[in-house]
Amino acid sequence: MDVSFINDKYDVAYPVVTGKHEMKAYKDNGKHIMNSYGILEPDPESNEEVSKDDLDVIIVPCVGFNEKRMRLGHGGGYYDVYLKESRTLKIGVAYEIQKLDDLIYEDHDIKLDLIITERNTY
């Protein structure tokens, strides 16, 4: 899906995995590279890095979540490390079917400020 129109209306930064448990945000000037998962992402060599402290909102994908706003990710820990000590608004996005009553989480897992599904906001 082409979402390039968003860049015309908002200042948007996209996540790029840059190392083990390391993720950074970059503006998108149209120059991309294919990552190891086959996903196009902004080329860190050609795009401006954005400090997480300069972001107004961070949209976080959820594999699963609970009503306490704890999320289950893909297991790499990238978002947990990136969001640690960040005061930026953290919004998770998921489908209601991904809600888990018995989600197990650990001390290093980051609680989100909101989780939005197609039916509810937590």
Language model: regions and residue ranges:
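Short glycine-rich anion-binding loops that position phosphate/pyrophosphate groups of nucleotides
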Residues: 63-65
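Surface-exposed, charge/polar-rich loops and edge strands
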Residues: 53-58, 67-70, 80-122
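N-terminal active-site beta-alpha-beta segment that forms phosphate/nucleotide-binding
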Residues: 1-54
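Short Gly/Thr/Asp-enriched flexible loops that form oxyanion-binding sites at enzyme active sites
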Residues: 1-4, 69-80
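Residue-level signal for inorganic ion chemistry
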Residues: 12, 59, 75, 115
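Mid-sequence acidic-hydrophobic segments that form the walls
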Residues: 42-46, 61, 85
